[in-house]
Regions:
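Aromatic- and glycine-enriched beta-alpha-beta binding-site module
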Residues: 208-238
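N-terminal/edge-of-domain interface segments
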Residues: 178, 184-186, 191-215
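Active-site and NAD+-binding cores of ADP-ribose-processing enzymes
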Residues: 1-192, 227-351
Length: 351
């Protein structure tokens, strides 16, 4: 899927990226006013807004400002789109990814970004982002020649064959569905929220210059890791299924449907507001027809966290993936010595 303004505005993560671009504008009166307006407008829309704490003074006299989405939109409209450097775009992308959470209601910022009031403001940002040189690779397929796998904090790599991992994934998913089905009426019950293949499968992202693999930074709800081992991979031969948008995801779910209503109904219901049947791909079946499956950046921005309709099969969503991530169903070979990387602030550096 080619990255377009419509692509960005179609999905929750794409809209959040556009909002983050404006929030990264250089400091100034307009940027400060917009930051203030967005903060309070989002606070009012958040189902879990938290508590305002007064550090000094009389807290009892404080009244939270009431800022409407229309007022926040007006403040954002006065902010000039910042220079869309590669660094700024990647920072906005990483922020949009890090704030993804599919086991709870959407954040106030995500709700705000989906309002009609903000659409004209985000449209101009989306058009600029889609036309920026730094996003030219966001719609591309898997880049086989520069793949690398990330292992956080020296976590061990799985020694099982990918075929065994996929087969066990299916049996564990069946057991999980049966278990949750016994408690189907408990609306408080949480559950698995991801829709990925088996986590222990080899998975990788492309390497971009000296910054290393994008998988070091583009991590949903990251745990604040400060060290990682990076293993360059030789991508296996064979077809790689491309998920470049909701249509591709829907086609995969229809071709290999796996029901997950019992385990996902509460978590995906909270994050999307939808009730009904849920499906995801049967990854064990998908593994029988391809060497891997790749989620492009534009596919992620348009699809992650979005309700993807499947007709009589219900609906699905992409959750738990990273942009540009490939899960490999075939064995992979290490192509170069493993590297140690450490994080200094927001920057990863090779040791």
């Amino acid at each position: 899927m080619t990255l377009t303004a419509d692509t960005l505005l179609a999905g929750p993560r794409g809209r959040r990226l556009c909002l983050e671009v404006l929030r990264l504008a250089p400091d100034g009166p307009e940027a400060r006013d917009a930051a203030w307006a967005v903060s309070w407008a989002a606070q009012a829309l958040d189902e879990n807004p938290g508590t305002v704490v007064a550090i000094a003074g009389d807290a009892s006299s404080f009244t939270e400002p009431e800022v409407s989405p229309a007022e926040a939109a007006a403040a954002l409209a006065r902010v000039a789109i910042p220079e869309l450097t590669d660094a700024l775009l990647f920072t906005a992308l990483s922020l949009a990814v890090d704030h993804a959470a599919y086991w709870q209601p959407p954040s106030g910022e995500d709700v705000l970004a989906a309002t009609e009031d903000l659409q004209p403001v985000l449209e101009r940002v989306a058009a600029a982002v889609a036309g920026a040189p730094g996003t030219s690779w966001w719609g591309s397929g898997v880049e086989r020649d520069t793949q690398a796998m990330v292992r956080w904090e020296n976590s061990p790599a799985s020694m099982e064959a990918p075929e065994e991992l996929s087969a066990r994934w299916r049996s564990e998913q069946v057991e999980e569905e049966v278990s949750f089905a016994r408690q189907i009426d408990d609306v408080r019950l949480s559950g698995s929220w991801w829709s990925t293949p088996a986590f222990a499968l080899p998975r990788s992202t492309r390497v971009r210059g000296t910054a290393g693999p994008v998988g070091l930074t583009l991590v949903e709800d990251s745990w604040g890791w400060t060290s990682a081992r990076v293993r360059p991979l030789a991508a296996p031969d064979g077809e790689v299924i491309e998920i470049d948008g909701p249509e591709a995801w829907a086609a995969l779910c229809r071709r290999h449907p796996f029901p997950v209503t019992a385990s996902r109904r509460n978590v995906w219901g909270r994050t999307t507001g939808r009730e009904g049947m849920w499906m995801q791909p049967d990854w064990a079946a998908v593994a029988g027809e391809a060497a891997g499956v790749h989620l492009s950046v534009s596919g992620y921005l348009a699809t992650a966290g979005r309700v993807v309709g499947l007709g009589d099969l219900g609906a699905s969503t992409v959750a738990g993936w990273g942009p540009d991530e490939t899960f490999w169903f075939s064995p992979v070979e290490q192509s170069a010595p493993e590297q140690e990387w450490v994080r200094d602030g927001d920057t990863w550096n090779r040791v």
